């Protein structure tokens, strides 16, 4: 077969024609270049700060923007946002979404699409603004990817999990038939603006929810980040990762930056997930099924933490983690008041959870297990017997005497 290359308007894209036994044929080869920015920008709604206005600018014409905002975020920041936009001559319309896990369905995506259509969002130069947690940015991202076959959007994550995970990658998604993120696309926002000041109004549980995903990054690739969580975890929650006199400002900013950097280092070379062996899938082998089975009792990060605890015990049983290392891992989880077990975590559910993950990973477990703290290996041979033994170990260690001796009678969130 001889191929003849034709001209192309796009670098890296080619059209070839060739002949087969039955006649003419063509092959299309195209590359999609993607670049986007993730910017830490404190005091985002300060009228003197032009960053948001610049992101929404239309050049010489007055900006007109659709803003999809979480209902809670609107109650907290709606007036401040409106004053900022008015001060920068941005005409806007709010689409308010009560963005919780139960609303993470296609019906909510269609609500956003309806708002986009009614507003008259053009195809290229008027990005929709998504302002809220990871659930909201996932919903808006999916709507933007579908509307006119892809329109741009800008993310302002207001939760920690949005700032270090859901709001900085390429994936969008909603749940379908009790399956986590079963429907989705790859459609990164052109810009993500991270203002740690929003965390000041985040409740402690949702802050811990984000710290669970930071712990994920720490355990598989960043031992220094783990040390920071171990040393400052409680105060990070107490002070909502805010700077201040006697506060954890320096540690908080370092934790945030290392978490974002670590996540992006893993995502960038494999943005479209052509490679299904992903370090950032640590904590995500069992957790999608656990989270959906326990809904609405568990937040995403809490389900991930249960998965990480189970995976860490599996690693310990295989000699990848020492007893001391496993103790440190579980102690940090308890320090952050994150769960390590839940009543839905039966052997049958975990068997089904792993089976579904194997389908998602194209027939392989590709399960990341920690090897020491700050490193990981992939395994493909975890057995049901190992899972049941790990569940038993977790149940036995649920409230270890050493923790009570160190910290007294405290609610450990398990």
From Swiss-Prot:
Active-site residues (renumbered): 171
Molecular function, one GO term: metal ion binding
GO biological process: antibiotic biosynthetic process
InterPro entries documented for this protein: Dehydroquinate_synthase, DHQS/DOIS_N, DHQS_C, EEVS-like
Top-rank lineage group of the source organism: Bacteria
Annotated catalysed reactions: D-sedoheptulose 7-phosphate = 2-epi-5-epi-valiolone + phosphate
Pfam families named in the record: DHQ_synthase (PF01761), DHQS_C (PF24621)
Enzyme class (EC, first level): lyase
Positions of Zn(2+) binding: 213, 284, 300
UniProt keyword list: Antibiotic biosynthesis, Lyase, Metal-binding, NAD, Nucleotide-binding, Zinc
Signal peptide: none
EC number: 4.2.3.152
Entry keyword DNA-binding: no
Residues reported to bind NAD(+): 70, 101-104, 134-138, 158-159, 171, 180, 198-201
Cofactors named for this entry: NAD(+); Zn(2+)
Record-linked Gene3D superfamilies: 3.40.50.1970, Dehydroquinate synthase-like - alpha domain
Keyword Flavoprotein: no
Family, as annotated: Belongs to the sugar phosphate cyclases superfamily. EEVS family.
Role: Catalyzes the cyclization of D-sedoheptulose 7-phosphate to 2-epi-5-epi-valiolone. Involved in validamycin biosynthesis.
Protein's name according to its UniProt entry: 2-epi-5-epi-valiolone synthase
Organism encoding this protein: Streptomyces hygroscopicus subsp. jinggangensis (strain 5008)
């Amino acid at each position: 077969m001889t191929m003849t290359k034709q001209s192309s308007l796009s670098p890296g894209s080619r059209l070839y024609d060739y002949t087969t036994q039955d006649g003419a044929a063509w092959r299309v080869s195209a590359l999609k270049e993607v670049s986007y920015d993730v910017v830490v920008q404190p005091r985002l709604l300060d009228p003197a700060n032009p960053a948001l206005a610049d992101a929404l600018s239309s050049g010489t014409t007055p900006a007109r923007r659709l803003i999809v905002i979480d209902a809670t975020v609107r109650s907290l920041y709606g007036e401040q946002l409106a004053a900022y936009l008015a001060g920068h001559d941005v005409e806007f319309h709010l689409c308010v979404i009560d963005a919780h896990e139960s609303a993470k369905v296609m019906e909510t995506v269609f609500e956003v699409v309806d708002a986009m259509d009614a507003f008259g969002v053009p195809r290229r130069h008027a990005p929709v603004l998504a302002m809220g947690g990871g659930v909201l940015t996932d919903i808006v991202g999916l709507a933007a990817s579908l509307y006119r076959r892809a329109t741009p959007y800008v993310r302002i994550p207001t939760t920690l999990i949005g700032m270090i995970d859901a709001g900085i990658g390429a994936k969008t998604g909603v749940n379908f038939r009790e399956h986590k993120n079963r429907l989705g696309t790859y459609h990164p926002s052109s810009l993500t603006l991270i203002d740690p000041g929003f965390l000041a109004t985040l409740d402690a549980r949702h802050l811990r929810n984000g710290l669970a995903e930071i712990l994920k990054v720490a355990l598989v690739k960043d031992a220094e980040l783990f040390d920071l969580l171990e040393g400052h975890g409680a105060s990070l929650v107490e002070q909502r990762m805010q700077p201040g006199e006697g506060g954890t400002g320096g540690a908080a900013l370092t934790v945030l930056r290392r978490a974002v950097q670590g996540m992006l280092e893993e995502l960038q070379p494999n943005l479209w997930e052509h490679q299904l062996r992903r370090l950032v899938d640590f904590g995500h082998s069992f957790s999608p099924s656990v989270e959906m089975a326990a809904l609405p009792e568990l937040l995403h990060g809490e389900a991930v933490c249960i998965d990480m605890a189970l995976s860490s015990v599996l690693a310990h049983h295989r000699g990848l983690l020492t007893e001391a290392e496993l103790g440190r891992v579980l102690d940090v989880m308890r320090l952050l008041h994150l769960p390590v077990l839940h009543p839905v975590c039966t052997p049958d559910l975990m068997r089904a959870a792993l089976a579904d993950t194997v389908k998602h990973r194209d027939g392989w477990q590709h399960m990341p297990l920690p090897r020491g703290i700050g490193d990981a290996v992939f395994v493909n041979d975890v057995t049901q017997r190992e899972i049941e033994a790990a569940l038993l170990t977790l149940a036995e260690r649920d409230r270890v005497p050493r923790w009570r001796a160190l910290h007294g009678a405290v609610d450990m969130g398990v």
